[in-house]
């Protein structure tokens, strides 16, 4: 029906908000001129992003291992039957994937010369420093998906 309101459930919002916010932050980054890290700190910034994403992956992997280590507990069985664990494991997986993607993008960008930024020409739109657009999106997505997992873990701990 035309003009029908779109209503999202809290579960749907939970699933999509990291992607939507990351896209919004990326648009804002582009709107403010898509600044690159300073040339003297270029590789340090990219290395820090790769290192932070490796820490994220380690934290998320350890979190999943700890949860799986409690698989014989009654609480684990209840959480599994409720569907909470499969949802949480899916969110952990997406957070790990986004963090690994950020690390890979950071390493790839180290091969670009910060003194000669690359502009992307898409249709009739010229995006300065366009090679950083995916990096900014992945950086925001990595942080937002990690925050989502952390928030759900704290909600889980509040129930115990």
Where are these regions (language model features)?
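Alpha-helical transmembrane segments and their membrane-interface junctions
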Residues: 98-120
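Alpha-helical transmembrane segments
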Residues: 44-60, 136-139
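Long, highly hydrophobic alpha-helical transmembrane signal-anchor segments
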Residues: 5-51
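Membrane-interface segments at loop-to-transmembrane junctions
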Residues: 5-9, 79-93
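Membrane-interface segments at the starts/ends of alpha-helical transmembrane spans
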Residues: 42-44, 49, 121-131
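Membrane-helix interface/capping segments
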Residues: 62-82
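Alpha-helical transmembrane segments and their immediate juxtamembrane interface regions
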Residues: 124-160
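Select subsegments of transmembrane alpha-helices in polytopic membrane proteins
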Residues: 15-22, 90-103
């Amino acid at each position: 029906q035309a003009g029908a309101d779109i209503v999202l459930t809290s579960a749907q919002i939970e699933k999509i908000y990291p992607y939507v916010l990351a896209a919004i932050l990326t648009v804002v980054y582009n709107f403010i001129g898509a600044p690159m890290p300073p040339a003297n700190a270029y590789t340090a910034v990219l290395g820090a992003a790769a290192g932070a994403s490796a820490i994220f992956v380690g934290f998320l992997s350890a979190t999943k291992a700890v949860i799986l280590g409690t698989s014989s507990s009654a609480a684990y069985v209840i959480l599994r039957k409720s569907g909470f664990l499969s949802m949480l494991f899916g969110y952990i997986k997406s957070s790990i994937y986004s963090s690994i993607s950020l690390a890979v993008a950071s390493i790839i960008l180290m091969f670009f010369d910060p003194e000669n930024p690359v502009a992307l020409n898409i249709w009739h739109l010229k995006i300065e420093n366009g090679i950083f657009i995916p990096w900014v999106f992945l950086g925001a997505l990595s942080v937002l998906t990690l925050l989502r997992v952390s928030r759900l873990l704290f909600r889980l701990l509040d129930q115990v």
